Amino acid sequence: MNASQLVAIQVLLDNAAFAALMVATALYWLAAAFRRVPLLHELGTGASAVALLSVTGLLTARWIETDHFPVSNLYESLFFLCWCVLAVHIAAEAFARQRLVGVFTLPVALGMVAFSSLTLSPAMKAGGPLVPALKSNWLMMHVSVMILSYGALMVGSLVSIAFLIVTWKQKDPELRGSSVGTGGFQKAEYTDSESTPPAGSMLSSLGVGGSETTVTLTSATATAGTALRRSNLAETLDNLSYRLIGLGFPLITVGIIAGAVWANEAWGSYWSWDPKETWSLITWFIFAAYLHARITRGWQGRRPATLAAVGFVSVWITYLGVNFLAQGLHSYGWLSGN
């Protein structure tokens, strides 16, 4: 298979990934609006899998074409980041069995593909040989691990943002089962001072008989059921975000260390306060504070979720923002169009 055929395959898979993500995003939003139609969510999951396979095929074709791991320019790295987000999303959804995850993650993945496909110039999309500075075995160790960490941290932060939206009317929701050693995703009890007591206790206090009592009990039971569902949803989102960020943090730590070792080999210095290095350290501290607060201070709920939302912005600044706003050692091959 020659280079032109590989390029044609990449264009086809690029379009397929974009179309699949558009369909998946629409289906997940429809599934959130019409919860009684489970087929919508199943179709959305299938479309997400098609998108993941399309991106996998595109990256594989680019790897064969260029004979190196496809993270040497912005186009390749965006698709690899999209692959990471989709893979983490599908795994998290299967693990937590929570349909709401895709409502937040898939629009982000769609935005990545749309930006790389519709905004970048043909020169920035084209594959080619590595520049001398990137011809190192550290390329895959550093860059791929960093982007993997971005994917996990982004999805974890998006789940935290989902938690903030779900609980925005509750001042201080009480959660259990989200900290270390509390049982993972086991169904936890939820108490809220504003919640309606269970139907059984209301029945004993109100007695039986009388249409007014029956109507009141039915309404109160429905309210309690809605509150319980929302509580279980908040519990799952808080739990899931904690574990995803716990997965991404070691990856970004390893990626930063690998980058420092590579920098010492290439330029004789472990750390040069390059803009991307500086922001990666800021991002590391944000998520280190998140995990420290949860593990040692027992933070749960809105406070760590707010910190994770700040981390989501910091990840984007680290990955993309500094390439637009500053020049440094990490700028070549990303926005230079080489």
UniProtKB/Swiss-Prot annotation:
It is found in: Cell inner membrane. The chain crosses the membrane at residues 11-31, 39-59, 76-96, 100-120, 145-165, 244-264, 278-295, 305-325. One of its GO terms (cellular component) is plasma membrane. This is Cytochrome c biogenesis protein CcsA. The keyword Cell membrane applies. It comes from Gloeobacter violaceus (strain ATCC 29082 / PCC 7421). HAMAP family: CytC_CcsA. Belongs to the CcmF/CycK/Ccl1/NrfE/CcsA family. InterPro entries: Cyt_c_assembly, Cyt_c_biogenesis_CcsA, Cyt_c_biogenesis_CcsA/CcmC. It is a multi-pass membrane protein. Keywords: Cell inner membrane, Cell membrane, Cytochrome c-type biogenesis, Membrane, Transmembrane, Transmembrane helix. The keyword Transmembrane helix applies. It comes from the Bacteria. GO terms for molecular function: heme binding. One of its GO terms (biological process) is cytochrome complex assembly. Required during biogenesis of c-type cytochromes (cytochrome c6 and cytochrome f) at the step of heme attachment. May interact with ccs1.
